[in-house]
């Protein structure tokens, strides 16, 4: 059979590469062609759908961003680092990172090198569909016969590279198989249960590369090969004699590829193709506006269902709450399971840890917020009293600091007392904006999806702040801080948290601090750390007071205290359990006391801690000279 | 017949039970962690609903315990279950082999500083019900000519966030009693009670409530206090909601009294942990049956009396102490007959 094929060879290229088949076609390519055509059509329709559901303004933003050199560069860098190399996973779990980059980057290189090879040695086949450009580069090794006498250095390098990357991918696949059996070995306590489509795609993905090795191995004596495919060829020859019946392996290889592409849109592997789009959207600065359409749809399909967020979720201290993890939220959104979507959306504490550790960067708390909006934004509210001039006193703070305590600080009067003492001790003049009557900062309303209501209070507050003539807005509650920073658009006014304020005073030497031998651990409040990116200032300032110990999980991996305003339905017992595990994490290195910088965290942690819990301002008040 | 009975806790329940067991002919060993007998009763001034003296009531109880081996400033160091008895090593070095144990460890007052929004321990003008009783008892009132005084009901009771959804049963009547008393001391002050709902379930409690309104002019506001702030002159600004008129209100007070509720006694719980006594969700010990056998624990020979199985009024506690004595007597007799 082989000799007939070779006899039918049509053209001889200078490098000694000969097409073994007339028309460069064989029936075995059909499964692959069907699969790849399906996925291309599906992707095109999907892309049009997603773009259609973006608002006109967002579309323009996206288009413009593609031509801004800085954003374009960032796009390229992000796509390379996140989609191919998976730097985020590498940083957290190196073995898991290796597995992902082996499969993603390895496969990518196989495709690129395969096309390069064809472009160099058989450029005719890239010229159009009729020349087999769809499948020819993929099955290049099947269609050619290489004259060993004409072997070139360039060809050998390609053979080597192809085998090298195939080995690279195979090592990743081996790890992936091992992970299925023992996920803990790769650093994952919980992993997701795959759906049917996931399984089909998963098993065909696993099979693709070993089959490719077999198929290319079987034909390695005809088409050439390197350190991997050649030995396979020799070995099988030793077993089966000279007449290798290679057709079944090529068929199997093609079928697996086809199956993978057919299952892809219904499986988690859609993330491979969606992630680049998500990166473009994110870098263009688009926002989620609807929970299932436009940007959100890109996020939903970019979720790789890896389940890293299950271990990260603070609710997982109880197994019954595992079902509220982001990965399941996204899964139910994708399946339009409305009842479950709303239940999960309302339960979430919105601590943002899942988004912080997500390898793809899916911001699921934001989608949950928008999902809440669909139900809660239409609820009735009446803030007409905000318009009457008598209800709220207008603060006057010409050139001074304006201090906004917020409702949670008012429920923890020690914090307010301490902040005021520090302000006085540092000789700063200030005005207390909500000492007596104040308006809600709007963040709790935003979190519960009552965006319209939030806009009312935000607008009223914004007016008060801008008209006060202050230069700095000092905030003692991170919940308020986040909304002041993100939604207020206060021009010419510096919005700072009291940890930043105190840190500045420490740096400028404006507080006379008595250093103690006390050891402390600092708890990162969600809204301050992950929410506003403030990790270093509180730590730096605290180091001037005593020894700062580390907690196993801190900074962007810090655990939520459990009492976040974000959850609309989590009950007190469950919250208590979360607080307990947060305290346990903080006490690992046996500090003398716990310090935090959020009134909510302060209350929660204090209720469960066995060591004293201090507010950041309070501990400074205890250790500075207040009045001369 | 000189069976040893160990009674843990020398409050009203422990005293009353000891007296009864002694009368039945048992050898009673009563231990109390404080230096004085009487528990919370020893710190109180007058008792609702009739305003009788706590001191006299306690004297009447202690008069009856002659012949009881009584150790104050003593705690259980270790407790072991033997075949049909309990072996307790006390902190004073004495070892007791008891045929039955009665736990009458009572309650601790809720730590009012946990409700930080009320400012206990932060603002000088904020005190608790126990602080006020102490002031009454020592006749050292903290204020001169106050203009307004407030009482907050349900501090640490019926409050899921404070970790206690249950009612503490006695605070409503205590608050009304204290409000009347304070009005007697300061007739010119306005007195407010902030309540959720008033649970005036006992005989004469309702009369007390009516008297408070009619004779003393105490103003009852249905709604919880949301926050308390200190003003420049040291007075307190209290924000609350009047849920009957659906309006937020704010009043300026000279003193705010927090009606701290009942929590399980920590000393009692540490005894319980020695022999793995079970507690219910509220932290109080679980009885064999909440209707028929509230004095019995799930361990043979181990009994309860008083507030260690949940908030109780003084009369309830005394009844339970007596019935626990009867149960212990029955248990001992049945056990000896088997021998």
What are these regions (language model features)?
Chain B
Residues 1-339:
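Residues forming the flavin
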């Amino acid at each position: 059979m082989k000799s007939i094929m070779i006899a039918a060879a049509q053209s001889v290229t200078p490098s000694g590469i000969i097409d073994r088949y007339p028309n460069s076609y064989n029936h075995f390519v059909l499964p692959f062609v069907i699969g790849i055509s399906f996925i291309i059509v599906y992707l095109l329709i999907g892309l049009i759908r997603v773009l259609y559901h973006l608002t006109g303004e967002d579309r323009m933003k996206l288009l413009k961003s593609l031509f801004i050199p800085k954003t374009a560069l960032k796009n390229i860098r992000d796509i390379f680092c996140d989609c191919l190399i998976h730097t985020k996973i590498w940083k957290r779990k190196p073995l898991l990172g290796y597995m992902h980059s082996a499969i993603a980057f390895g496969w990518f290189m196989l495709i690129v090198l395969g096309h390069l090879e064809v472009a160099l040695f058989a450029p005719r086949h890239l010229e159009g569909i009729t020349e087999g450009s769809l499948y020819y580069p993929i099955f290049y090794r099947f269609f050619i016969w290489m004259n060993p006498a004409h072997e070139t250095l360039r060809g050998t390098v390609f053979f080597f590279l192809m085998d090298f990357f195939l080995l690279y991918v195979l090592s990743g696949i081996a790890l992936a198989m091992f992970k299925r059996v023992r996920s803990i070995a790769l650093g994952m306590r919980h992993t997701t249960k795959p759906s049917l489509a996931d399984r089909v795609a998963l098993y065909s993905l696993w099979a693709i590369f070993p089959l490719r090795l077999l198929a290319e191995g079987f034909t390695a004596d005809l088409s050439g090969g390197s350190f991997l495919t050649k030995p396979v060829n020799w070995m099988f020859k030793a077993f089966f004699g000279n007449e290798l019946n290679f057709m079944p392996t090529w068929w199997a290889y093609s079928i697996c590829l086809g199956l993978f592409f057919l299952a892809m849109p219904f499986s988690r592997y859609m993330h491979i193709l969606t992630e680049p789009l998500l990166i473009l959207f994110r870098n263009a600065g688009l926002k989620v506006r609807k929970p299932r359409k436009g940007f959100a749809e890109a996020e939903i399909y970019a979720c790789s269902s890896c389940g890293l967020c299950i271990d990260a979720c603070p609710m997982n201290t109880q197994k019954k709450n595992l079902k509220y993890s982001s990965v399941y939220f996204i899964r139910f959104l994708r399946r339009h399971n409305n009842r479950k979507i709303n239940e999960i959306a309302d339960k979430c504490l919105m601590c943002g840890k899942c988004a912080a550790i997500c390898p793809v960067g899916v911001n699921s708390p934001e989608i949950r917020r928008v999902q809440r909006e669909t139900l809660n934004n239409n609820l009735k509210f009446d803030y007409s009293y905000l318009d009457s001039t008598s209800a709220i006193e207008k603060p006057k703070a010409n050139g001074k600091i304006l201090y906004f305590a917020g409702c949670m600080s008012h429920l923890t009067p020690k914090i307010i007392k301490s902040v005021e003492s520090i302000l006085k001790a540092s000789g700063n003049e200030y005005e207390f904006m909500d000492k007596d009557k104040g308006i809600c900062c709007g963040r709790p309303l935003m979190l519960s999806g009552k965006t319209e209501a939030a806009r009312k209070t935000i607008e009223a507050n914004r007016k008060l702040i801008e008209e006060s003539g202050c230069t700095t807005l000092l905030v003692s509650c991170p919940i308020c801080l986040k909304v002041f920073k993100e939604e207020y658009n206060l021009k010419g006014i510096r919005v700072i948290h009291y940890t930043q304020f105190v840190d500045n005073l420490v740096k400028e030497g404006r507080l006379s601090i008595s250093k103690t031998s006390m050891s402390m651990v600092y708890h990162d409040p969600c809204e301050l750390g992950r929410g506003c990116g403030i990790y270093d200032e509180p730590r730096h300032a605290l180091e001037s007071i005593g020894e700062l110990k580390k907690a196993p999980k801190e900074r962007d991996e810090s655990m939520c205290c459990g009492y976040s305003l974000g959850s609309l339905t989590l009950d007190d017992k469950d919250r208590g359990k979360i607080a307990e595990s947060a305290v346990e994490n903080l006490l690992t290195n046996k500090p003398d006391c716990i310090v935090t910088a959020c009134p909510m965290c302060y209350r929660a942690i204090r209720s469960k801690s066995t060591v004293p819990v201090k507010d950041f301002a309070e501990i400074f008040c205890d250790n500075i000279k207040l009045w001369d | 017949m000189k069976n040893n009975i160990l009674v843990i806790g020398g409050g009203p329940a422990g005293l009353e039970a000891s007296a009864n067991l002694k009368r039945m002919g048992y050898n009673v060993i009563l231990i109390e962690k404080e230096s004085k007998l009487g528990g919370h009763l020893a710190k109180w001034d007058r008792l609702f609903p009739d305003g009788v003296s706590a001191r006299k009531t306690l004297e009447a109880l202690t008069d009856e315990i002659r012949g009881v081996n009584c150790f104050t400033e003593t705690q259980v160091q270790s407790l072991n279950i033997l075949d049909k008895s309990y072996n307790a090593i006390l902190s004073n070095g004495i070892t007791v082999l008891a045929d039955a144990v009665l736990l009458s460890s009572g309650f601790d007052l809720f730590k009012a500083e946990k409700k930080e929004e009320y400012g206990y321990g932060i603002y000088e003008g904020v005190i608790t019900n126990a602080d006020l009783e102490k002031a009454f008892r020592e006749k050292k009132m903290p204020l001169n000519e106050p203009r307004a005084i407030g009482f907050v009901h349900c501090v640490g009771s019926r409050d899921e966030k404070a970790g206690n959804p249950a009612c503490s049963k006695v605070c409503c009547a205590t608050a009304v009693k204290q409000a009347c008393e304070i009005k007697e001391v300061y007739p010119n002050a306005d007195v407010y009670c902030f309540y959720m709902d008033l649970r005036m379930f006992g005989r004469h409690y309702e009369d007390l409530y009516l008297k408070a309104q009619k004779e003393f002019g105490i103003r009852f506001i249905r709604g919880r206090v949301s926050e308390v702030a200190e003003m420049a002159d040291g007075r307190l600004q209290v924000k609350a909601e009047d849920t009957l008129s659906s309006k937020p209100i704010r009043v300026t007070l000279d003193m705010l009294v927090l009606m701290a509720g009942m929590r399980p006694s920590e000393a009692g719980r540490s005894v319980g942990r020695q022999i793995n006594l079970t507690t219910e969700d509220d932290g109080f010990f679980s009885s064999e049956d909440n209707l028929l056998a509230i004095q019995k624990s799930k361990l043979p020979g181990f009994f309860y009396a008083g507030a260690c199985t949940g908030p109780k009024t003084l009369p309830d506690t005394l009844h339970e102490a007596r019935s626990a004595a009867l149960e212990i007597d029955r248990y001992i007799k049945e056990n000896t007959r088997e021998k």
